[in-house]
Swiss-Prot record:
Residues 5-128 form the MsrB domain. Pfam families: SelR. It comes from Lactiplantibacillus plantarum (strain ATCC BAA-793 / NCIMB 8826 / WCFS1) (Lactobacillus plantarum). Residues 1-25 are annotated as: Disordered. One of its GO terms (molecular function) is peptide-methionine (R)-S-oxide reductase activity. This is Peptide methionine sulfoxide reductase MsrB. Its EC number is 1.8.4.12. The keyword Oxidoreductase applies. One of its GO terms (biological process) is response to oxidative stress. The active site is at residue 117. One of its GO terms (cellular component) is cytoplasm. It catalyses: L-methionyl-[protein] + [thioredoxin]-disulfide + H2O = L-methionyl-(R)-S-oxide-[protein] + [thioredoxin]-dithiol. Residues 1-12 have a biased composition (Basic and acidic residues). The lineage of its organism: Bacteria, Bacillati, Bacillota, Bacilli, Lactobacillales. Belongs to the MsrB Met sulfoxide reductase family.
């Protein structure tokens, strides 16, 4: 194990590490942010990169936090994922290459038709009231 991975193992919970570094999936309906609707942004738990806004979150009923779009498409990479005999599109963050979840073409049509199905363990929530203090002041405008 290299030094960076060792530091991540110390900083992250076992579930956060398994999800972001080993592409694990948390159990449906078990994640902290599945049924969570405060206003703010969701960032990569590894790098802090801004990923999703609560304004784009919706209840897809799938058991994981679901979003119609990222804050900035350039903050995500998409990869073909054919593991477990399925044909899916994996979503990772660009800064830390953290596994986040998958994107599916079955989201609300009136909001672009995509469903970003994301593991809570890959995310950290920053409330609107804390955006400036936490270094994310540039995202205040998303909530005005």
């Amino acid at each position: 194990m290299d030094k960076q991975q060792g530091e991540l193992r110390q900083r992250l919970t076992p579930e956060q590490y398994a999800v972001t570094q080993e592409a694990a999936t948390e159990r449906p309906f078990s994640g902290e942010y599945d049924n969570f609707y405060q206003e703010g942004i969701y960032v990569d738990v590894v790098s802090g990169q801004a990923l999703f806004s609560s304004r784009d979150k919706y209840d897809a009923g799938c058991g994981w936090p679901s979003f119609t779009k990222p804050i900035d498409q350039t903050n995500l990479n998409e990869h073909r994922d054919e593991s477990f005999g399925m044909h899916r599109t994996e979503v990772t963050s660009t800064q830390a290459n953290s596994h986040l979840g998958h994107v599916f073409p079955d989201g609300p049509r009136d909001r672009g038709g995509l469903r970003y199905c994301i593991n809570s363990a890959a995310l950290k929530f920053i409330p609107v009231a804390d955006l400036e203090k936490a270094g994310y002041g540039q995202y205040q405008s998303l909530f005005k």
